[in-house]
């Protein structure tokens, strides 16, 4: 019997959603927070241009504050949660989209809410693309090990630019020029080179 074909991880606007996880005021001290928020904001702009549905969560906003304004998520109604996974809070959004195949995941913290959200989505048979330059943790050890754990569990590790080009698909797309302007904006250092260099054994 032929071996099962591995998932390719294709991302298409009509079968994808963008998840924005807990980028709130009280997390400003988290390492590379400003940088990953800027990349998540870029993903949100592209999602709006391509009509990709987007959901936004806030972890215990009474204590951790609202979503930071620089994300540009004004107009999105945040889902308040206490569970680390986003999935229980946004289950109705998932149920409303039977065509959904892929979730693009940005936010904080990688070892907690990002990991548990990804595991719940994978358990539902969805493909998960963790936007590595739009996720971070207070500890870079936690960030590194969480990314490795996500990969072991079947999530795809992708950069924002790689996913953006998958979503737009073709230079003749009517939104390509607007998206190209976003891609050409300088990308901040989100600390990833230090995690992946020197043949890190967690990513062999």
UniProtKB/Swiss-Prot annotation:
Cytoplasm keyword on record: yes
GO cellular component, one term: cytoplasm
Predominant localisation class: cytoplasm
InterPro entries per UniProt: Isochorismatase-like_dom, Isochorismatase-like_sf, Isochorismatase_domain
Domain of life: Eukaryota
Keywords carried by this UniProt record: Cytoplasm, Nucleus
Pfam families according to UniProt: Isochorismatase (PF00857)
Subcellular location: Cytoplasm; Nucleus
CDD domains: YcaC_related (cd01012)
Subunit description: Interacts with CDKN2A.
Name this protein carries in UniProt: Isochorismatase domain-containing protein 2
Gene name for this UniProt entry: ISOC2
């Amino acid at each position: 019997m032929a071996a099962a074909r591995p998932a390719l991880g294709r991302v298409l606007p009509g079968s994808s959603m963008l998840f924005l996880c807990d980028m709130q005021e009280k997390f400003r001290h988290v390492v590379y927070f400003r940088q990953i928020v800027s990349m998540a904001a870029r993903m949100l702009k592209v999602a709006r241009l391509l009509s990709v549905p987007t959901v936004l969560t806030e972890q215990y906003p009474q204590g951790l504050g609202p979503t930071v304004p620089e994300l540009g998520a004004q107009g999105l109604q945040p889902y308040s949660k206490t569970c680390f996974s986003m999935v229980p809070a946004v289950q109705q959004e998932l149920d409303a989209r039977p065509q959904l195949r892929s979730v693009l995941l940005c936010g904080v913290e990688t070892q907690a809410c990002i990991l548990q959200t990804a595991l719940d989505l994978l358990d539902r048979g969805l493909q998960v693309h963790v936007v590595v330059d739009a996720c971070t943790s207070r500890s870079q050890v936690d960030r590194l090990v969480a990314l490795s754990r996500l990969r072991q569990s079947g999530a795809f590790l992708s950069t924002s630019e790689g996913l953006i080009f998958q979503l737009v698909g073709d230079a003749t797309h009517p939104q390509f020029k607007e998206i190209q302007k976003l891609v050409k904006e300088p990308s901040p250092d989100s600390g990833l080179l230090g995690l992946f260099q020197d043949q890190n054994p967690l990513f062999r």
